[in-house]
Swiss-Prot record:
It is found in: Secreted; Target cell membrane. Transmembrane segments: none annotated. Expressed by the venom gland. This is Antimicrobial peptide VpCT4. The modification Leucine amide is found at residue 39. It comes from the Eukaryota. Residues 40-71 form a propeptide. Residues 1-23 form the signal peptide. Belongs to the non-disulfide-bridged peptide (NDBP) superfamily. Short antimicrobial peptide (group 4) family. GO terms for biological process: defense response to bacterium; defense response to fungus; killing of cells of another organism.
């Protein structure tokens, strides 16, 4: 009974490794390319990619629209 349980656990672990290996290799390759790109000058880039989305000032039209929306 113990042997069957051990075989079952080993089989489950092996199946999990097979099914997750694609994600593991993708993560490792992605991490490697990220590290390599950060080492060179070309890896330095502007990380403020969401500055165009956020606008701190609201115009009068925006305020009117929000007031109409919240009524």
């Amino acid at each position: 009974m113990k042997t069957q349980f051990v075989i079952l656990i080993v089989a489950i672990v092996i199946l999990q490794l097979i099914s997750q290996s694609e994600a593991l290799w993708g993560a490792l390759l992605g991490l490697g390319s990220t590290l390599l790109s950060k080492l060179g000058k070309r890896g330095v880039q502007n990380m403020d990619q969401f500055d165009d989305i956020f606008e701190p000032e609201l115009s009068e039209a925006d305020l009117r629209y929000l007031q109409d929306l919240l009524r």
